[in-house]
Amino acid sequence: MLAVKVYNTLTRKKEEFKPLVPGQISMYVCGPTVYNYIHIGNARSSIAFDTIRRYLEYKGYKVKYVSNFTDVDDKMINEAHAEETTVPKLAEKFINAFLEDTTALNIEPATLHPRATHEIKEIIAFIQTLIDKGYAYESHGDVYYRAKKFKHYGELSDQNIERLEEGASEHINDEEQNRKEDPIDFALWKAQKEPDEIAWDSPWGKGRPGWHIECSVMSTKYLGDTIDIHGGGQDLEFPHHENEIAQSEAKTGKKFVNYWLHNGFVTVGKDQEKMSKSLHNFVTVHDILKEVDPQVLRFFMASVQYRRQINYSAENLQQAATILDRFKNTLVNINYRLEDDTPSKDSDELAKAIAKTNEKFEVAMDDDFNVQNALTAIYDLLPIVNANANAEKADKKSLKLFKDKLSAWLLVFGIDTEKLCSQSAGSNDEIDQLVKKRDEARKKKDWATSDQIRDQLKEMGITIQDTPQGTRWTRD
């Protein structure tokens, strides 16, 4: 097995990936705060790390993949109030919506999807340990983490703690200043503000957990004190992931994560502005899937290396659709040839080209999941494959090999080739009957009828291809 290299945000360099347990990988990816439908930017993270997970599984690793639901925080409380519902009901609605959207995008379910509200007992115990060790303190019912006590604070995001402290002091209000020992300290537990606000009993009074502590608790509970891979968007690098490290390593005394991976943003418009709910420039997956084929959206998002930005536009979506169509039509072409009764001609040429492409694919993906180079290698093979499929005598053994390989390669990107082909060709009786009538007209040299049927099929979104092996059709 060739070694996979990943870019580790903590060390700012590519490193050879070595899991704690040979053949097994523990992986935690920060999930959504479930107060609304996910937008394309949220989906980018889910798709990026699903693609990484799929490739690691393709390599033979057994991956335990944990991704949480943040089902209580300020946004949840505010949205529940605005919708005149409860936080649990709001969470349930949008957890179900998230699962529907990710299923449509063929994102594999996590091994575990823990919810913060189901881990309150563990969160309270975790916080108490930090207090006992001197890393946290109670103040007016809140509990804060002493950031400066953790000597590695700021290393993940490459920030100086003194500068962080200066920045925090400029944005802190008088009430927070009175509660905190230091402006840079962050909340582990938040006291209940209103009698009807969702809260749990704790040694410090009624309240709820802070966002950062939730992920520390859930990741270590289900994956252990040290995790192989922790992923998330670049916007989570600070303060969220920085705080996770501080909390977790202070509690356990062990390295929290061996490899930190962060995906790039989705941008929109000519100015390539970051897509976010706070900027009100987002498009939800729920809405976009009403207009865009889920496989096209999935392929578009998966075909850009995870650390790079993606510019979301109709033009870029169309480009992805065109590439996907090329793969689709090649598979349809192969299927027709494999099903016809023409003799096969075995040859080493195509088999060798497939083996070389497989090598290029894996070399690219082993290099920090370079999906662009991997897809280029596959795409460059298509003319050779199609030429063989259209030859008088095709190498059917190698065509079958390519079909199987392409299915495995594209599955890494979340594309199911059987589903892809079912959208392109099939046993639609109406179309088959029209094609049959056209063939009969051609045999009689009734070109007017033949052309009329071709035009009729074109209006139905069907493209006709006349080959030595017979007439083939695909959906546009």
UniProtKB/Swiss-Prot annotation:
Keywords: Aminoacyl-tRNA synthetase, ATP-binding, Cytoplasm, Ligase, Metal-binding, Nucleotide-binding, Protein biosynthesis, Zinc. A motif ('KMSKS' region) lies at residues 274-278. Monomer. Binds 1 zinc ion per subunit. Zn(2+) binds at residues 30, 215, 240, 244. It is an enzyme of class 6 (ligase). HAMAP family: Cys_tRNA_synth. Its cofactor is Zn(2+). A motif ('HIGH' region) lies at residues 32-42. ATP binds at residue 277. GO terms for cellular component: cytosol. It comes from the Bacteria. It catalyses: tRNA(Cys) + L-cysteine + ATP = L-cysteinyl-tRNA(Cys) + AMP + diphosphate. GO terms for biological process: cysteinyl-tRNA aminoacylation. Belongs to the class-I aminoacyl-tRNA synthetase family. Its EC number is 6.1.1.16. GO terms for molecular function: ATP binding; cysteine-tRNA ligase activity; zinc ion binding. The keyword Ligase applies. This is Cysteine--tRNA ligase. The gene is cysS.
